[in-house]
A protein has these predicted regions:
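Structural motif
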Residues: 1-3, 20, 64
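A short glycine-rich, His/Asp/Glu-containing loop-to-beta-strand
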Residues: 1-14, 71
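Conserved beta-strand segments that form the floor/walls of ligand-binding pockets within enzyme
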Residues: 5, 33, 48, 68-69
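Short, conserved beta-strand element in jelly-roll/cupin
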Residues: 5-7, 17-32
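Short histidine-centered beta-strand/loop micro-motifs
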Residues: 11-17, 58-59
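Short strand-coil-strand connectors
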Residues: 33-37, 60
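Short acidic-glycine-tyrosine-enriched beta hairpin
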Residues: 36-51
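Ligand-binding loop in jelly-roll beta-barrel domains
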Residues: 51-75
Length: 75
């Protein structure tokens, strides 16, 4: 578990992870790109990203606060 903080316009430098991941958006806006598709990000939204899948947040106009959890079948 952790907290991702991105300032307005800050680049998200994530690389694919070896575990599944769940994101919970605490506050902010922008988009989450998973593979080649963009999903709108806003407060209280949840997202699932499977392991080894490219993804990153972008185009946030406010500070973005996201709680994340790693896991999988063996967790």
């Amino acid at each position: 578990m952790g907290l991702l903080l991105l300032q307005s316009g800050e680049k998200d430098t994530q690389i694919p992870h070896t575990s599944d991941e769940i994101y919970y958006v605490i506050s902010g806006d922008g988009f989450l790109r998973i593979k080649n598709k963009d999903y709108p990000v806003s407060q209280d939204k949840l997202f699932f990203v499977a392991k080894d899948v490219e993804h990153h947040f972008h185009s946030n106009t406010k500070e973005l606060k996201v709680l994340y959890f790693f896991g999988g079948p063996d967790s």
